[in-house]
Regions:
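Short, small-residue-biased leader/transition segments that mark boundaries at the very start
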Residues: 2-6
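Flexible glycine/proline-rich, aromatic-decorated loop/lid segments
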Residues: 9-32, 218-222, 264, 308-353
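Structured alpha-helical segments in the cores of large, soluble enzyme domains
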Residues: 21-26, 219-225, 229, 248-263, ...
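Glycine-rich, flexible beta-strand/loop modules in the N-terminal catalytic cores of phosphate-handling
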Residues: 29, 36, 178, 183-268, ...
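Long, charged amphipathic helices and adjacent flexible linkers at domain junctions
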Residues: 72-75, 79-86, 377-403, 450-470
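Extended amphipathic alpha-helical scaffolds
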Residues: 77-215, 397-411, 419, 426-427
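Long, amphipathic alpha-helical stalk/connector segments used for oligomerization, subunit docking
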Residues: 350-370, 374, 378-385
Length: 540
């Protein structure tokens, strides 16, 4: 059970860090216009209550703005009445209503767009003497007619553009592990919207460094959303991400953040890329579903799967219809884009944009209830494909963290970093050590990590008297040879301990780089004394 409180002022940065909800609400005196939020699996009643509370609290600011307008504001502009557009609207309605109505019964987006294009070309050709301004008014009347026809059909309980009723989610197709070499991947298709989502795991060093007005920080979870022109049948230069792509990526990221494991439990840096290959409504929510699937496919221990759905609204006067899983045309011709993402337990992200003067509590409540039903439906399909995180992929990097005594840190690092650099070059692994003695080993694969761990274990191991070690000759001197038996630990094999027989010249018996077995027979002022002769005597 969660205990919560509501503050009547803006929260501090510290409070937001520990808050279950971060929400921005914009509106007028009478209605809500925009909501942007992220949450930690809150139920629909709490989210609705937060929106209404935000609307209530903004009234003081609205009142102050109204008072300022009365004191210092200017008169409102009076727009000139456009007398031509209504005439064009009447002409187009009489001649093209039936054709447009039939076009909007075509379920396939490409075919429907082509049919609408033919009608549009016919309209343009029927006004050969129209100048640019007049033609603009004609096309404006055409768009209004499109909008009126689609909206009236929906409000009169007729099938939507693709034949669905207001509550049905489009057919969903899901695959995971579609890119076997990737750490995690998924293909999420809902109707004519499709996303290929790939998850990549990296070390803590791969975390994104952020400098903001709040200070410096790092982010171990990155989500990049790409919307290429071909996904909507267009062409264009693949330049850097635009505002829309950044916004959609941030929304999907906020939806997933609530279910990510703590850094202490899962030290990987996670990067997800959602590539939209086809789009006809709510590719951002497809990215949410695909991200959840790909992270679980990569073995990331999410606390719960996350799904997202986009809701729409058609409103005329007091009549309204809330649409589940809107198409691109329904988004364009409708009054609201209401995106809800979350788990079976609750909502993790909510975004709402309104094109009309605002919506009331009843509409928001209806939208949230319908979104919950749709989200549960999608989660049910997702869980049939993958219901819990897999084991880490063989292609994924391997990582292990453990604590060591603080006085051992310098031994692992070595003088001038020599030991840790050599270790990383030899194994290809990355080693991070913090001041508390937390050591994190990150290998390109299991064997790389295990090789590095073995070296560290050797460094931490204390030489044991009378134990036999396999060592490497690192240096030959006149009186013997120095043999490395543990990482960073060399002992002296005296010339008298090489053999039972007298050895005149060490170079006649040993050479640098030679691997041999030696026994630790004692310590001389902290220095290790090694023997090969002791092994021969034991064998005899």
């Amino acid at each position: 059970q969660r205990q919560m409180c509501i503050r009547d002022s803006n929260p501090s940065y510290e409070e937001l860090e520990n808050s279950y909800l971060d929400m921005v609400v914009a509106g007028t005196e009478k209605a809500v216009l925009m909501v942007e939020s992220e949450a930690k699996e809150l139920n629909e009643d709490l989210m609705l209550g937060a929106v209404l509370f935000g609307h209530q609290e903004m009234q003081a600011v609205i009142k102050a703005c109204t008072e300022l307008k009365q004191k210092a504001g200017k008169e409102d502009w009076v727009l000139n009445t456009d007398e031509e557009t209504p005439v064009y609207s009447a002409e187009l309605t009489e001649k093209y209503s039936e054709q447009i109505t039939n076009a909007f019964t075509i379920k396939d987006k490409t075919e429907r767009t082509a049919a609408i294009g033919v009608i549009k070309d016919d309209i343009v050709s029927s006004y050969p003497d129209a100048d640019e301004i007049q033609l603009g008014k004609v096309l404006g009347a055409f768009k209004n007619l499109e909008k009126d026809i689609v909206r009236k059909n929906i409000l009169s309980n007729q099938p939507r553009i693709d034949g669905r009723d207001t509550d049905t989610v489009r057919p969903i197709f899901i695959e995971t592990d579609v890119l076997p070499s990737a750490h995690g991947s998924s293909l999420f298709t809902r109707g004519e919207t499709q996303a290929i989502v790939v998850a990549t795991l990296g070390s803590s060093r791969d975390a994104q460094r952020i400098e903001s007005i709040e200070g410096q920080s790092t982010d171990n979870f990155m989500l990049h959303y790409n919307f290429p022109a071909y996904s909507v049948g267009e062409i264009g230069m693949p330049l850097g991400p635009k505002r829309r792509e950044i916004g959609h990526g941030n929304l999907a990221k906020r939806a997933i953040k609530a279910v990510l494991p703590d850094v202490e439990d899962f030290g990987y840096t996670m990067r997800v890329v959602s590539e939209i290959t086809e789009s006809n409504g709510s590719s951002s929510m497809a990215s949410v579903c695909g991200t959840s699937l790909s992270l679980m496919d990569a073995g990331v221990p999410l606390s719960s799967p996350v799904a997202g759905i986009a809701m729409g609204l058609i409103k005329e006067g007091d009549e309204f219809a809330v649409l589940t899983d809107i198409l691109g045309d329904e988004d364009h011709l409708g009054d609201m884009d209401f995106k809800v993402a979350g788990t079976e337990t609750g909502i993790t992200a909510l975004q709402m944009d309104i094109k009309i003067s605002g919506i009331n509590e009843s509409i928001m409540e209806t939208a949230l209830v319908k979104a919950k039903a749709a989200r549960d439906h999608i989660l049910g399909i997702m869980n049939k494909t993958i219901s819990k995180p897999k084991e880490l992929s063989e292609n994924a990097p391997a990582m292990k963290s453990f604590m060591v005594d603080k006085d051992k840190i310098k031994e692992i690092i070595g003088k001038g970093g020599a030991v840790i650099k050599s270790m990383q070059e030899q194994t290809g692994a990355t080693v991070d050590i913090n001041d508390d003695g937390m050591v994190s080993v990150f290998g390109q694969n299991q064997s790389s990590m295990q090789e590095c761990l073995a070296i560290i274990e050797g460094i931490l191991e204390e030489p044991e008297l009378n134990k036999v070690y396999k060592g490497t000759v690192v240096k030959i001197v006149e009186f013997g040879a120095f043999v490395n038996i543990l990482p960073g630990k060399d002992g002296l094999l005296h010339i008298s301990e090489i053999s039972n027989e007298r050895t005149e010249n060490v170079n006649d018996v040993l050479e640098e780089g030679q691997v041999l077995e030696v026994k630790l027979i004692g310590f001389d002022r902290g220095k290790m004394k090694l023997s090969m002769k002791a092994l021969i005597e034991n064998a005899e």
